[in-house]
Amino acid sequence: MATKIFLASPVISATRTPIVPKAIASRLGTSLAAALAATSVLTMVPVLPAAGEGNQTYKIYYGTAASAANYGGYGGNSDRKTSAEYVYDVPEGWKERLVSKVEKGTNGTDSEFYNPKKKTEKEYLTFLAGFRQLAPRDVILNNLALSDVELQDLIAGADKVVSEERKDETGQVYYLYEIDGVGKHSLITVTCSKNRLYAHFVNAPAPEWNRDHDTLTHLRDSFKTVSSS
């Protein structure tokens, strides 16, 4: 497992070497403009909390990739679990924000949930078509920021950005980023699957991050894509 730490320095280089959080890299060879959307379902299956999470319980969210043009269709698939492209956990009591068709077709936002007691404590997922494999970690993060002004600002003012690479039991690579910003914390997980780039975000203001650290890291770790059987 490799870890990279991004600090205030003009150097971009290999693992464990600092780079500038303020640098927003140009662009990948593949355009980020094209985006798919998804149709998804939240199951009522409870997930037991891990040690340190108190009595927090979760539901499993299943997302199935579809084009923005097909968003809102419900016909022909009574069990979306069988066609899920990705899953992640949602804390019991969090609310879903319905993503518009325009959002799905432009910036790739696919799903979003938030804490009704503090709406800026949330998790959401975006995905983009046309990515067969991951680029270097710093390039991926910088290109995500190109279409996300809030992420740009968070990186620009961050005290520290840490990244690492993990592989699951099938060998699929996931990039994990932790951004310690001004008054805000963000956990981002990125992977490629079936020619799509998936990015799962968990964001929280500093007080909620300090209070809900275990829950928020659980959400980060729960995200994965679903392989074809």
UniProtKB/Swiss-Prot annotation:
Location relative to the cell: Plastid, Chloroplast thylakoid lumen
Swiss-Prot/TrEMBL GO biological process terms: photosynthesis
GO molecular function: calcium ion binding
InterPro entries in alphabetical order: Mog1/PsbP_a/b/a-sand, PsbP_C
GO cellular component, one term: extrinsic component of membrane
Location, primary (coarse class): plastid
Disulfide bonds: none
UniProt keyword list: Chloroplast, Plastid, Thylakoid, Transit peptide
Protein name: Thylakoid lumenal 19 kDa protein, chloroplastic
Taxonomic classification: Eukaryota, Viridiplantae, Streptophyta, Embryophyta, Tracheophyta
